[in-house]
From Swiss-Prot:
One Pfam family of this chain: RPA_C
Family: Belongs to the replication factor A protein 2 family.
Keywords: DNA damage, DNA recombination, DNA repair, DNA replication, DNA-binding, Nucleus
Assembly notes: Heterotrimer of RPA1, RPA2 and RPA3 (canonical replication protein A complex). Interacts with RPA1C and RPA3.
Protein name: Replication protein A 32 kDa subunit C
């Protein structure tokens, strides 16, 4: 039974194998003479059963095997791994029935393959009953013992009752193929697109320099203005090395200083921990616009000892002074210190409203006026909410505008209709 298990991944066994007899091999003429068993060879565990394959893949592998052997029984392999059993799925396009066998052609949309199923007992007759033109079947095929004839021996035939099995079969074919060729493809890639490498440079003391490249350095050799960025590390006399991160210095020198991208600068020092500076946004158009719309500039001032100042800017101060204080973004002020750690983090204070911040911050915003009217205590006390006419009276806006605003707020989930299309109530009841 161990020999039979190598031909099948399921429970479909040949009658001769169930009785314990060796599996027969058939010649191209169909005489039924048993061939001498070939010595066992070590194989990939993934190929111990039937390998899912397409007809196109089988045809290419068969042609390569015939060209390599030059005659006799070819050594069939899938992606370089020797195997003799494959599983194909397709539609039967032609059938020739005889007393001893049934020959049919299977088409899986990548090609056609001729197959034969020998009839020896009633179980074979049952399997051959599934072979009908236009029917989709799944076939386990043995490709040994046919000399130069391109014909496979159908070991097990099962009809397809769910079309999802067709999709699953092709997914399995792709999975097995990619698993087999993945390592080979990785070795064939040029060095410029291979995976990342890490460079470590020894230092005179302290912790070693650790350099990580997150993107491959492709097309290095172009003009410096379009090259990808390069991390630069400067040695120090002791302690921890300076850690510098560059987020792309593209087209440096091609434009005026106002539109050049930001450059992080780090200076060596005699001891302690180096300055850690991160710039999230480039300094674009600095000096071209008024100060109220200029982007943020990180400033670091050296000091006498301790840890350097750590400054993080999350958002640029855009349009400072143009809007009310509630919608202005924050400003940053950093001063040098004589020692210790000085870290100042300003979070954005935009649209600081008690509720409904997504409706905007203008004083006369129609949506805000309607929401404020619905938040009045006397309106909240009404069981069915406020009538549209009452909102018109309180806001002074036309009824058509009120209806449009209310529909928009209802779609956004801020208000809801109650007893009819004229009564509306706020989702926030105080």
């Amino acid at each position: 039974m161990a020999a039979a298990a190598s031909y099948f991944s399921g429970t479909a066994l040949m009658p001769s194998q169930r009785s314990g007899a060796p599996a027969p091999e058939y010649s191209a003429a169909g005489t039924g003479a048993a061939a001498a068993p070939s010595p066992s060879k070590p194989r990939d565990p993934r190929f111990s059963g039937c390998v899912p394959a397409t007809v196109l893949h089988i045809s290419r592998s068969f042609a390569a095997a015939l060209a390599a052997d030059g005659g006799g029984d070819p050594v069939f392999s899938i992606d370089g791994v020797e195997t003799t059993n494959v599983r194909v799925l397709g539609r039967v396009v032609s059938v020739v029935s005889r007393d001893t066998d049934v020959c049919f052609t299977l088409d899986d949309s990548t090609g056609k393959i001729p197959l034969v199923r020998w009839i020896t007992d009633q179980s074979d007759t049952r399997d051959t009953s599934y072979i009908q033109e236009g029917v989709y079947v799944k076939v386990q095929v043995n490709l040994m013992g046919f000399q130069a004839k391109k014909q496979g021996l159908a070991r097990s035939i099962r009809p397809i009752n769910n079309f999802n099995e067709v999709v699953l079969h092709f997914i399995e074919c792709m999975h097995v193929h990619l698993e087999s060729v993945q390592s080979k493809m990785q070795r064939q890639l040029p060095p410029s697109v291979q995976t990342n490498e890490y460079t470590h440079v020894p230092s005179s003391g302290g912790v070693r320099d650790y350099q990580v490249h997150f993107t491959p350095q492709v097309n290095q050799g172009l003009p410096p203005a379009v090259q990808t960025n390069t991390s630069t590390y400067v040695p120090l006399l002791g302690g921890v090395r300076d850690h510098q991160a560059h987020f792309a210095q593209v087209n440096q020198g091609q434009f005026s200083p106002a539109v050049q991208a930001n450059t992080s600068t780090h200076l060596p020092f005699s001891g302690g921990v180096g300055e850690h500076q991160i710039h999230f946004t480039p300094k674009v158009n600095q000096g071209q616009f008024p100060p109220s719309v200029q982007t943020n500039t990180s400033a670091h001032v050296p000091y006498s000892g301790g840890f350097r100042e750590h400054q993080v800017h999350f958002t640029p101060p855009v349009n400072q002074g143009q809007f009310p204080p509630a919608v202005q973004t924050n400003l940053y002020n950093h001063a040098a210190s004589s020692g210790g750690v000085r870290e100042q983090v300003h979070l954005t204070q935009a649209n600081q409203f008690s509720a409904y911040s997504s409706t905007g911050g203008l004083q006369h915003d129609p949506q805000r006026m309607v929401l404020e009217a619905l938040q009045q205590p006397d309106i909240l006390a009404l069981e069915h909410g406020a009538h549209v006419d009452e909102l018109v009276r309180r806001t002074g806006m036309p009824k058509a505008n009120i209806m449009g605003v209310v529909k928009h707020l209802a779609a956004a989930g801020f208000v809801y209709w109650t007893i009819d299309d004229n009564h509306v109530k706020s989702m926030c009841n105080g």
